A protein has these predicted regions:
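Conserved beta-strand segments of alpha/beta enzyme cores
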Residues: 89, 114-116, 160, 181-184
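Class I SAM-dependent transferase core
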Residues: 1-62, 68, 98-115
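A short SAM/SAH-binding and catalytic strip from SAM-dependent methyltransferases
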Residues: 131-150
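Conserved SAM/SAH cofactor-binding pocket of Class I
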Residues: 53-135
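Conserved beta-strand signature within the Rossmann-like core of class I S-adenosyl-L-methionine
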Residues: 156-168
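Residue-level signal for inorganic ion chemistry
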Residues: 26, 165, 202
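Helix-to-beta-strand junctions that scaffold the AdoMet/dcAdoMet cofactor pocket
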Residues: 85, 152-157
Length: 204
């Protein structure tokens, strides 16, 4: 938990309480449904919460804007971002319903009211548009952009697709035919875990 306040100093008391409650809730649910690698749970705040909040260091989601978390699983990056941006609506989408149920239960337990969930695939969503799409370690950029582009509103800022990814992305970016802006996450957060972690933004 201290690692969050190392980088973010202006949380409200409510946000601090919500972040503080996350680990025990995820540990409890992880014993029933595996949403986080067992070996990662001791580094929960660094590897999962702080990693997701890399997005918040570069993007300011506006009050009332709608953000889709594509392939959210148990709620990453959607749940940490929903705590960080309480006036932004986050729509968590995943094809595995039991993982979404974990995100729903945890959001309810900490009093998050700006989260909705949908058990579906992104390509099956119709008649719904979002200001931005966020995702973490879900699929190749080519597929993420193909699924996201039809769901993005036009003429809003910030907009587009934001992905958290790791490893050598040169081939993946080339094959996507996208020209994303790329941030090295270890230039944002200095912990060794973030080496070779990247954040990509494809504007709409």
């Amino acid at each position: 938990m201290d690692i969050l306040t190392k980088y973010f100093s202006d949380f409200t008391e409510t946000q601090l309480q919500q972040f503080a409650a996350l680990k025990d809730l995820y540990v409890e649910w992880n014993q029933k449904i595996n949403v986080i690698s067992r070996k990662d749970i001791d580094n929960f705040y660094e590897h999962h919460v702080l990693h997701c909040l890399a997005i918040a260091t570069q993007f300011e989601f506006k009050k009332g804007s709608e953000v889709m978390d594509l392939g959210s699983g148990g709620g990453f990056p959607g749940v940490p971002l929903a705590i960080f941006f309480p006036e932004t609506q986050f729509h968590l989408v995943d094809s595995i319903n039991k993982k979404l149920n974990v995100a729903t239960e945890i959001a309810t337990a900490i009093g998050l009211q700006n989260i909705s969930v949908q058990h579906t695939r992104a390509e099956d969503i119709k008649n719904r548009k979002f200001d931005m799409v966020v995702t973490r370690a879900v699929a190749p950029l080519k597929d993420l952009w193909r699924w996201s582009k039809p769901l993005l509103k036009k003429g809003v800022a910030p907009n587009g697709l934001v992905c958290l990814k790791g490893g050598d992305l040169a081939k993946e970016i080339f094959e996507s035919n996208c020209r994303p802006r790329v941030w090295e996450v270890d230039k944002i957060f200095t912990e060794p875990f973030f080496k070779e972690k990247f954040m990509l933004h494809v504007p709409n």
